[in-house]
């Protein structure tokens, strides 16, 4: 896919197919970052062997890890980089603006059929999840070598060996590389082992062959394409200007804003301004970036049209979470949360 118009059209096709199936099965779709109805114990376990191991081990490092596994839903965006320098800038930006992303895309305010104190309870859960969060090293000039060091010194979740999943939580990937894991015969890791390890690092953003952005609550069709548009406009069209802004931010203040944003949303403070200010600033830069790209659809519209939803959020100071609360509070009817 070459641009947001194509990605959005493909997403619309998937949604159409999903609705065809769910209507036949009398299943409702809820576009939210957290299951608003079910209690954790009511959700059946995934029968896969790795989920059995994760269900046992994950809570040891984060009290809400099982909620992450079974009750959260996010919109993930994968972006490219064309050089190490390009990666360094993009990765520092996406980590620095996680608090803004949480506030702007908040959509998980209802938990177990009740209004919670959080606008993005999904983000709160991910902050209390084993192997997650925003490591301080992510705010540095993190090149490929430093990221590789971070990865190999990160604890292993599990190892696939002779058809079984084996807990690796007592070992780092470096231990694996040095042949220190007796229960797998001290064998060295394969490329598949590294791929598995990379996929079990649950930080807000992470590097594989591309950068994965994972800080957005999922949302309905009216806003689904706004996330890609917001980030692509900044990172592909206005990278240096955004980088100059975030380079002046103090990492301790970013982390504090990150911890407060799930509950306080736009009222969270960062560098003396609230997150609404920063969201508006970044949206303007994103819009300029998309205008520079000037990629048109068949009707002659450029990609800025996908930012219209976010502009309304900022103008009205009302997120998807606020709309969710308003709908639910009027009647406490959970059907109000279903996609129509």
Describe the predicted segments one by one.
Residues 82, 99, 218, 236, ...:
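Residue-level marker of positions within ordered structural domains that often coincide
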Residues 23, 28-30, 34-206:
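Loop-rich catalytic cores of soluble enzymes, especially ATP-dependent carboxylate-amine ligases
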Residues 140-161, 276-303:
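An exposure/low-complexity boundary signal
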Residues 16, 92-95, 99, 280, ...:
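Generic structural signal for well-ordered, non-transmembrane alpha-helical segments
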Residues 1-7, 80-87, 217-221:
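A generic structural motif
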Residues 1-65, 71, 209, 223, ...:
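Terminal catalytic/cofactor-binding subdomain
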Residues 171-256:
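Long, well-ordered mid-to-C-terminal structural blocks that present hydrophobic/aromatic surfaces
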């Amino acid at each position: 896919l070459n641009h947001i118009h194509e990605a959005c059209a493909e997403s619309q096709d998937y949604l159409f197919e999903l609705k065809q199936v769910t209507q036949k099965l009398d299943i409702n779709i809820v576009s939210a970052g957290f299951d608003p109805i079910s209690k954790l114990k009511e959700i059946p376990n995934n029968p896969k062997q790795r989920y059995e191991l994760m269900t046992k081990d994950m809570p040891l490092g984060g009290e809400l890890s099982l909620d992450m596994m079974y009750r959260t839903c996010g919109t993930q965006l994968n972006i490219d980089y064309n050089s190490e320098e390009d990666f360094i800038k993009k990765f520092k930006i996406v980590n620095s603006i996680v608090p803004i992303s949480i506030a702007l895309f908040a959509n998980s305010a209802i938990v177990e059929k009740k209004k919670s104190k959080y606008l993005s309870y999904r983000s709160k859960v991910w902050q209390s999840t084993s192997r997650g969060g925003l490591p301080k090293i992510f705010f540095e000039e993190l090149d490929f070598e430093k990221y590789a060091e971070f990865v190999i010194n990160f604890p292993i979740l599990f190892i696939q060996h002779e058809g079984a999943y084996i807990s690796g939580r007592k070992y780092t990937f470096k231990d694996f590389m040095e042949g220190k894991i007796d229960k797998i015969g001290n064998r060295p890791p394969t490329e598949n082992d590294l791929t598995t390890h990379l996929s079990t690092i649950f930080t807000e953003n992470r590097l594989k062959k591309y950068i994965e952005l994972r800080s957005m609550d999922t949302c309905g069709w009216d806003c689904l394409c706004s996330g890609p548009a917001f980030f692509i406009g900044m990172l592909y069209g206005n990278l240096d200007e955004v980088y100059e802004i975030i380079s002046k931010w103090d990492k301790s203040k970013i982390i504090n804003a990150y911890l407060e944003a799930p509950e306080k949303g736009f009222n969270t403070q960062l560098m003396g301004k609230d997150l609404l200010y920063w969201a508006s600033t970044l949206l303007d830069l994103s819009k300029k970036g998309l205008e520079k790209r000037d990629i048109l659809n068949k009707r002659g519209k450029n990609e800025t049209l996908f930012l219209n939803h976010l502009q309304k959020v900022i103008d009205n100071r009302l997120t998807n979470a606020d709309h969710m609360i308003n709908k639910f509070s009027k009647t406490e009817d959970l059907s109000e949360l279903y996609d129509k």
